[in-house]
């Protein structure tokens, strides 16, 4: 890679070091400064003329500073007559804001794509985009790599009874991700769904009205009850982030209805269904005193549950799901696995203290403080630098990268 160079932003120096070592090249000498007024200054101290430049900058806890720094580096390389500029973004910032979830929302991920293009980027390499459709936001080539081969290899090597495990999606939006991993490992999969706030008054009125309906309606309710009693469907209530005892037998559709769904007019009123972002937002935004429902579709009894999501950001949904899997569904243990470990605030501490979670597994796409790793004995970090380094090498040499979608590095 004589005509190539790699430049690292300030977001993830450890990953830069790992990738550079694998490629056998020394990172380009750059000066990253911040003025007293908060502005970012970038100085590239080596020539990049006619070079194939790869800029490594991931999302970080200072996401806006990291993004602005990346844009300035791209612009500086463009002004320095670089032959081609590739932004290597293991975790793409603002990827969760890739659609309008409410009226008058901004599609921020598309704006970030436009900013990168205007700055002068020629190519983007990223890993496990939150929504693969985001590739359509760009007018430049995008290579969306997968962490799945590395995660699958880790499972084979480190989970003793992985052949009997079940891959579980934390929400319906992650079904495609989970089924893909399940197919790779030849395992069964299961799905978890959480509904919105239940209204006891609404449910009681609904049940009272059921009693006055015709025999046909009563038959429908009975069938619903039988369906919910099947072994592969496990429903429970949770409150204050924990599963609660429910002595009341679920016998009516009101158990999975809510006043919110009945009265709220939203973006899904004309069809479609909420995504995993909406599920997460529902859990975090509802009143902490609101009783809610969680349902598992699948069988994890006596098995290891591999609870999968692309990002681990808020602990509440993982804790509730893990407690439900162990207490109500009979799972032997729960291993939480995600590509991007965005452990903000007390997230990692809360996951560590959860008795139902045995292990937390992430890749090093997102910078994690070394002290946090030392303090959390449940945390395992998979090195993903091999995938990124091989993608950089193949891109520079004009080779196909489809090989990376199936093989671990």
Swiss-Prot record:
Name the principal localization, coarsely classed. Answer: cytoplasm
Q: What are this entry's molecular-function GO terms?
A: ATP binding; kinase activity; magnesium ion binding; ribose phosphate diphosphokinase activity
The listed locations are: Cytoplasm
CDD domains, A to Z: PRTases_typeI
One GO cellular component, as annotated? cytoplasm
Where do the annotations place Mg(2+) binding?
A: 128, 130, 143
Family matches, as Pfam families: Pribosyl_synth, Pribosyltran_N
The keyword Cytoplasm belongs to this UniProt entry's keyword annotation? yes
Q: Which reaction does it catalyse?
A: D-ribose 5-phosphate + ATP = 5-phospho-alpha-D-ribose 1-diphosphate + AMP + H(+)
> Where does this protein act, in terms of pathway?
Metabolic intermediate biosynthesis; 5-phospho-alpha-D-ribose 1-diphosphate biosynthesis; 5-phospho-alpha-D-ribose 1-diphosphate from D-ribose 5-phosphate (route I): step 1/1
Question: What residues bear Phosphoserine in this entry?
Answer: 199
Q: Does the keyword Electron transport apply?
A: no
Q: Which keywords label this protein?
A: ATP-binding, Cytoplasm, Kinase, Magnesium, Metal-binding, Nucleotide biosynthesis, Nucleotide-binding, Phosphoprotein, Transferase
Signal peptide: which range, if any? Answer: none
InterPro entries per UniProt:
PRib_PP_synth_CS (IPR000842), Pribosyltran_N (IPR029099), PRibTrfase_dom (IPR000836), PRTase-like (IPR029057), Rib-P_diPkinase (IPR005946)
Q: What is its EC number?
A: 2.7.6.1
PANTHER family in alphabetical order: RIBOSE-PHOSPHATE DIPHOSPHOKINASE, RIBOSE-PHOSPHATE DIPHOSPHOKINASE FAMILY MEMBER
This molecule's function is given as:
5-phosphoribose 1-diphosphate synthase involved in nucleotide, histidine, and tryptophan biosynthesis. Active in heteromultimeric complexes with other 5-phosphoribose 1-diphosphate synthases.
Q: What is this protein called?
A: Ribose-phosphate pyrophosphokinase 1
Q: What is the lineage of its organism?
A: Eukaryota, Fungi, Dikarya, Ascomycota, Taphrinomycotina
């Amino acid at each position: 890679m004589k005509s190539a160079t790699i430049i690292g932003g300030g977001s993830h120096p450890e990953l830069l070091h790992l990738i550079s070592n694998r490629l056998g090249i020394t990172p380009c000498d750059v000066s990253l400064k911040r003025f007293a007024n908060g502005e970012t200054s970038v100085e590239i101290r080596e020539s990049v003329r006619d070079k194939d430049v790869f800029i490594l900058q991931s999302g970080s806890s200072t996401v806006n500073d990291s993004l602005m720094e990346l844009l300035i580096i791209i612009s500086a390389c463009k002004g320095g007559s670089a032959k081609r500029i590739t932004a290597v973004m293991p975790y793409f910032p603002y990827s969760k804001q890739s659609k309008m979830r409410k009226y008058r929302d901004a599609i921020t991920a598309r704006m970030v794509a436009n900013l990168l293009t205007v700055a002068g980027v020629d190519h983007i390499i990223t890993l496990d985009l939150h929504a693969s459709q985001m590739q359509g936001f760009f007018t430049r080539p995008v290579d969306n790599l997968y962490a799945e081969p590395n995660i699958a290899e880790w499972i084979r090597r480190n989970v003793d009874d992985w052949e009997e495990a079940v891959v579980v999606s934390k929400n319906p939006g992650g079904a495609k991700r989970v089924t893909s991993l399940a197919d790779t490992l030849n395992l069964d999969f299961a799905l978890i769904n959480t509904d919105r706030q239940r209204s006891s008054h609404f449910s009681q009125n609904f049940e009272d009205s059921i009693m006055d309906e015709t025999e046909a309606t009563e038959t429908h309710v009975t069938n619903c009850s039988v369906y919910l009693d099947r072994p592969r469907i496990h429903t429970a209530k949770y409150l204050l982030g924990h599963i609660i005892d429910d002595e009341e037998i679920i016998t009516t559709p009101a158990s999975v209805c809510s006043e919110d769904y009945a009265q709220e007019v939203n973006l899904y009123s004309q069809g479609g269904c909420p995504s995993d972002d909406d599920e997460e937002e529902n859990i975090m935004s509802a009143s902490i005193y609101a009783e809610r429902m969680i349902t598992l579709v699948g069988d994890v009894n006596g098995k290891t549950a591999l609870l999968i999501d692309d990002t681990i950001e808020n602990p509440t949904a993982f804790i509730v799901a893990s407690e439900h899997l162990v207490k109500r569904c009979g799972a032997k243990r729960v291993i939480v696995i995600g590509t991007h470990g965005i452990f903000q605030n007390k997230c990692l501490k809360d996951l560590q203290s959860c008795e139902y979670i045995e292990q937390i597994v992430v890749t090093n796409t997102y910078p994690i403080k070394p002290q946090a790793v030392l303090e959390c004995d449940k945390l395992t970090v998979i090195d993903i630098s091999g995938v990124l380094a091989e993608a950089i090498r193949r891109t520079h040499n004009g080779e196909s990268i489809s090989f990376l979608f199936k093989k671990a590095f």
